[in-house]
């Protein structure tokens, strides 16, 4: 029980307002389910002072390479930021810290209501889509059911799953919407994705030799990689990857390249293989066994329901592939050498995220359907802020880029997709 000086109390779970100013507010921590320890924050911000380092269990830059330090400078700054002095980089970092702190100070009930509303809407859409596919032999039901299921899967992966797994909603302390408990509608297990995406890609964004997302070990996506004859297949591999993107990511997350180099043991690989096998079996049973089987029993629509589910997954994969490739591969997004991050400060880390990422311009609906990854620059600066806040901070980030003479890469979806594909074709050649 805690006395309130003013204002009212809103229950985050229900949105209901309780009590009058001056009364007592009671807070309850559920003992029915205990949340595991929060994941270490390796994707957003490092402690700012000696006092904050002493007060947190987060690893420091000195202990964990790839996390930004407080003072110093990298051995070499990237070309796009070579004109900045150490003092300017430090001030830029403080300005971006202030933007983040402002959002954190105002984050609350409306944000919680937003994500719960999206989750409810997505689940109803998925249920409706699967229900229509139970009668998929009728063209109208087939088209509507496939469309609804496609959109539901896109929303679950992009706006919900990806962002929940970044810990954007961990502050709610809701066991059902937490980065340590959420399992998304994607073949690769959540924990595997968090390892390769959160812990590695966001830490080493576009650092050649560190960020495995630069080419995903199958594509040549940077001029510094020596050309080999197999790179002629760049466009073919990328086109084939798009419709089966979730399976490609599941294979990528196994880190077979690290097994070959001895960085990852075969025991670890077998553990990961079992995890992927269990997840893949569940996804296969849900999409390609349960829904078609029920449709066949009820209406004789089993084959049509199977085709509809295959289409929904394929279209989701193509969309996710397109959006993700727009994040770092369009013209204007820089890559970095290891010496450019050796000794980088907090401000330098911010600079790298800004000039190594690319946005997509468009409508509010388009931003939502990309999971707000259309605000890739803002997402890489603040990956643990609610995605619904990126549109709010984007003008401030763009103004900072302009004031410090840094590029802010953005453009319409088709232009960014075309730019990424142009790079795929260009780097297929010597």
Write out the residue ranges for each language-model feature:
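Membrane-embedded catalytic scaffold of the fatty acid hydroxylase/desaturase
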Residues: 151-272, 341-428
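Low-complexity, highly charged intrinsically disordered N-terminal segments
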Residues: 72-124, 128
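Alpha-helical bilayer-embedded segments of polytopic membrane proteins, i.e.
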Residues: 113-157, 232-247, 273-322
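Intrinsic-disorder-associated, low-complexity terminal segments enriched in Asp/Asn/His/Tyr and depleted
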Residues: 18, 38-41
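Extended hydrophobic/aromatic segments used for targeting, binding, or gating
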Residues: 275, 296-297, 307-345, 425-430
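Intrinsically disordered, low-complexity repeat/linker tracts enriched for polar/charged residues
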Residues: 4-16, 20, 26, 53
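Short, non-transmembrane cytosolic segments of multipass membrane proteins
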Residues: 45-48, 66-94, 233-244
